[in-house]
Amino acid sequence: MEKPARDLGTVSMRGGARLGQFNATWPFARLTADTKTLRLSVLGAPLNFTRESVLELSAMRGYISRGLQIRHADKAYPERIIFWCFDLDALTAGLRRLGWMVS
């Protein structure tokens, strides 16, 4: 199980992602965050969110895995975005350490 990579001010974890109706399984997505931005890279294509564009980060449970739903205000991205990972507790702890609110 992959632990989130940490440096002085970032958290990063590999996983899978759902973007609207599209689904990419592990290991084809990576979520990286610092104190100001959240970046979800899916199959090499980045989705970048500023703190202001993130409306809510919420932990959720799927059939098999757990994930982080990203509610956002960016009209260029699909409305439904979920990052699936194996260690949601470590991810949410890292995000909270950086000042992100996760419900």
Language model features: what each stretch is:
Residues 30, 37-39:
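Structural motif
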Residues 1-32, 73, 89-93, 97, ...:
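Anionic N-terminal interaction surfaces
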Residues 38, 48-62:
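Phosphoinositide-dependent membrane-docking surfaces
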